[in-house]
C-alpha cells in the first residue's frame, strides 16, 4: 500500500485526513484522546474497522495522560475516556468492540502498576491495527474466489484501505482478485452526500492501478439492466444475527437493484462487525448527521436556505438481498443466523 490510514508513531496517532482527499494527501498528528474522538466524529477517519482502530489508539492516549494516585481513580477516569469514544458514532459496532476489548485488557492488568496498565493498552491498540491488516487480507483471499475473470464489480461508499488499517474489506476482495492476476474493472458509486466513492474509492483504485469507472448513485440500475455489472461487493458497519446489514446510505437501493437484475450482491466484513446480540437489522441504531452535509458541497450551497433535510448516514439491507457474507474465517450463505454463529465461533 502506498499510504497509511492510521498508525501509532512516537506515542502519537497519525491519520490520513480523509476530508482532504482526493485533492491533498495530508497526515494529521493526534496526541490526546479528545482530538481522536473529534477526528472520528468529523470523519477525518471513517469506515467501521478504521474507527475501531482509532478508538483503541485514542483510549491508549487517554490512559497515558490520566493523572491518578490510585487504581480506583485511574479506572474511573479510563471509563470516562471510553465514554467519550462511545459517543462519537453510534452505528459502527467495531467502535464498541474496540472499546470493550481495551477495557478487558485494562481489567486483566489491574494487579499491575499504573504504568504497566498504560503499556498494556498501548500494545493492545497497536495489536488491533496489526490484526486488522491480516484480517482484511484473509477477507480478500476468500472473497477473490467469488470474483470471476473479466468481472465488472460495482461497489458503494469506501470499504478500502482508507476504511480499515490499510487493505480493505470490499476493496480488499477487489484488490486480492487484481493481485491474483484477474482482469477486472470496478464501477464506483459516488456515494452522496459525503462522496466517499468519488473522493476515496476512486482515489484508491487509481493509486493501485485497478481500472475504475465513477458513476453517480442513480446510474447503478441503468448499468445493471444493460448487463454491464457482474457482481456487487460492499462493506458493512454492523451485521445483525440474521444477516441484515447496516452500511452506508444507499446500499439498500443497490442491493434491491442487484436482486431485480439477478446480480450477486456480496457483503465483506470482519467478524468484529457482527452484532449477534441483535436478532435483526431493525434494532441497529442509525446515525443522523448534520443537514449541511446534504445542502453544501465543499462550502458551496446547492439547496435553498430553509429547506428541510433528512440525513441518515446508514441504511439496513435485509439479508434476503445478500448473496453471501465474506469474513476472514470464510464465506457464509443461506442460513445466516446459523452460519454467522458458526463462523464467529459462538
Swiss-Prot record:
Annotated site location: Transition state stabilizer: 157
Pathway: Amino-acid biosynthesis; L-methionine biosynthesis via salvage pathway; L-methionine from S-methyl-5-thio-alpha-D-ribose 1-phosphate: step 1/6
Active-site annotation: 237 (proton donor)
Entry keywords, A to Z: Amino-acid biosynthesis, Isomerase, Methionine biosynthesis
Gene Ontology MF term list: S-methyl-5-thioribose-1-phosphate isomerase activity
Catalytic activity: 5-(methylsulfanyl)-alpha-D-ribose 1-phosphate = 5-(methylsulfanyl)-D-ribulose 1-phosphate
GO-annotated biological processes: L-methionine salvage from methylthioadenosine
E.C. no: 5.3.1.23
UniProt-listed InterPro entries: IF-2B-related, IF-M1Pi, IF_2B-like_C, Initiation_fac_2B_a/b/d, M1Pi_N, NagB/RpiA_transferase-like
Gene3D superfamilies per record: translation initiation factor eif-2b, domain 1 (1.20.120.420), Translation initiation factor eif-2b, domain 2 (3.40.50.10470)
Residues noted as binding substrate in the record, renumbered to the chain: 46-48, 89, 196, 247-248
Family designation: Belongs to the eIF-2B alpha/beta/delta subunits family. MtnA subfamily.
Function, as annotated: Catalyzes the interconversion of methylthioribose-1-phosphate (MTR-1-P) into methylthioribulose-1-phosphate (MTRu-1-P).
Protein name, entry field: Methylthioribose-1-phosphate isomerase
Organism: Pelobacter propionicus (strain DSM 2379 / NBRC 103807 / OttBd1)
Amino acid at each position: 500500500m502506498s499510504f497509511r490510514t492510521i498508525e501509532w508513531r512516537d506515542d502519537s496517532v497519525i491519520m490520513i485526513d480523509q476530508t482532504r482527499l482526493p485533492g491533498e494527501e495530508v497526515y494529521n498528528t493526534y496526541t490526546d484522546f479528545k482530538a481522536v474522538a473529534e477526528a472520528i466524529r468529523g470523519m477525518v477517519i471513517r469506515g467501521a474497522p478504521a474507527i475501531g482502530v482509532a478508538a483503541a489508539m485514542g483510549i491508549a492516549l487517554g490512559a497515558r495522560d490520566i493523572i491518578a494516585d490510585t487504581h480506583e481513580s485511574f479506572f474511573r477516569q479510563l471509563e470516562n475516556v471510553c465514554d467519550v469514544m462511545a459517543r462519537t458514532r453510534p452505528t459502527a459496532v467495531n467502535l464498541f468492540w474496540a472499546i470493550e476489548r481495551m477495557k478487558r485488557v485494562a481489567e486483566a492488568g489491574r494487579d499491575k502498576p499504573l504504568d504497566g496498565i498504560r503499556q498494556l493498552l498501548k500494545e493492545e491498540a497497536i495489536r488491533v491495527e496489526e490484526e486488522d491488516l491480516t484480517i482484511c487480507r484473509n477477507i480478500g483471499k476468500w472473497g477473490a474466489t467469488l470474483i470471476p475473470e473479466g468481472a465488472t464489480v460495482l461497489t458503494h461508499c469506501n470499504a478500502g484501505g482508507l476504511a480499515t488499517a490499510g487493505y480493505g474489506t470490499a476493496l480488499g476482495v477487489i484488490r486480492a482478485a487484481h493481485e491474483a492476476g484477474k482482469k477486472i474493472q470496478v464501477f464506483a458509486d459516488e456515494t452522496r452526500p459525503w462522496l466517499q466513492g468519488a473522493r476515496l474509492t476512486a482515489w484508491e483504485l487509481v493509486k493501485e492501478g485497478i481500472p475504475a469507472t465513477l458513476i453517480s448513485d442513480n446510474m447503478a440500475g441503468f448499468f445493471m439492466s444493460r448487463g454491464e455489472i457482474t457482481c456487487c461487493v460492499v462493506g458493512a458497519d454492523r451485521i445483525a444475527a440474521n444477516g441484515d446489514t447496516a452500511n452506508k446510505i444507499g446500499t439498500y437501493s443497490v442491493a434491491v437493484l442487484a436482486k431485480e437484475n439477478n446480480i450477486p450482491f456480496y457483503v465483506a466484513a470482519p467478524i468484529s462487525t457482527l452484532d449477534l446480540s441483535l436478532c435483526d437489522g431493525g434494532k441497529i441504531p442509525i446515525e443522523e448527521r448534520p443537514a449541511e452535509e446534504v445542502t453544501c458541497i465543499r462550502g458551496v450551497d446547492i439547496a435553498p436556505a430553509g429547506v428541510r433535510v433528512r440525513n441518515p448516514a446508514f441504511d439496513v439491507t435485509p439479508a434476503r438481498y445478500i448473496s453471501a457474507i465474506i469474513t476472514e474465517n470464510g464465506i457464509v450463505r443461506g442460513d445466516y443466523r446459523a452460519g454467522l454463529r458458526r463462523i464467529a465461533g459462538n
